[in-house]
């Protein structure tokens, strides 16, 4: 019997349950810290390699001290845009990281049908990405951030893992740089036009009431 199995057998004994639960809590805390460390380190890598974007981390809605991902914002301020992102999501009883392009707000049907948006959507579909109401494109990665393999790899060869994860965003930005820029520009202009139309309609109503 090896040492690891001997330890597991020790904790499996009923009289050792209090100690086993205490160790489990300690391990959960370590997993959470390493998970946060991963997202913070990845965010720093992406900030250094993508000067044209602002990078923000994403917190768990139910636990603000827990980081679950990151996303990129264009330098130009706008409410509606497509943002590159990576995030961890529960898949059954484990967590898995996915990435892609997420809508920053709900687009109108007309905005979804803009030619640059339609073309970009088709490009990602042909590359094997999925889409839904929240995402123009998304795809699972091979990363399970709470798994033993992932945690040990991050603890021993963090640079290699972070470089791999960073390359997912970098490849997306490089491969679709012009199309993504055109899409976000079109969304900004369409939102501005819609706002102008609303203001003009309000002025018309005021004039009619006089």
What function would you assign to each model-found segment?
Residues 107-210:
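Ampiphathic alpha-helical segments that act as solvent-exposed interaction surfaces
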Residues 1-45, 174-180, 184-194, 198-209:
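N-terminal domain-onset segments
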Residues 10-150:
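Polyanion-binding interface signature
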């Amino acid at each position: 019997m090896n040492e690891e199995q001997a330890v597991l057998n020790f904790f499996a004994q009923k009289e050792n349950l209090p100690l086993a639960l205490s160790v489990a809590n300690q391990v959960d805390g370590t997993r959470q810290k390493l998970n946060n460390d991963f997202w913070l380190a990845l965010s720093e890598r992406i900030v250094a390699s993508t000067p044209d974007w602002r990078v923000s981390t994403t917190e768990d809605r139910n636990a603000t001290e827990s980081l679950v991902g990151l996303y990129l914002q264009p330098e130009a301020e706008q409410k509606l845009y497509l943002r590159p992102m990576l995030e961890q999501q529960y898949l059954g009883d484990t967590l898995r990281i996915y990435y892609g392009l997420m809508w920053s707000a709900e687009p109108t049907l007309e905005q979804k049908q803009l030619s640059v948006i339609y073309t970009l959507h088709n490009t990602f579909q042909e590359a094997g990405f999925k889409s839904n109401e929240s995402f123009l494109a998304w795809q699972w990665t091979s990363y399970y951030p709470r798994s033993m393999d992932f945690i040990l790899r991050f603890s021993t060869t963090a640079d290699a893992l972070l470089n791999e994860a960073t390359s997912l965003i970098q490849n997306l930005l490089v491969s679709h740089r012009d199309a993504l820029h055109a899409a976000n520009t079109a969304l900004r202009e369409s939102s501005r036009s819609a706002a102008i139309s609303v203001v003009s309609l309000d002025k018309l109503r005021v004039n009619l009431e006089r």
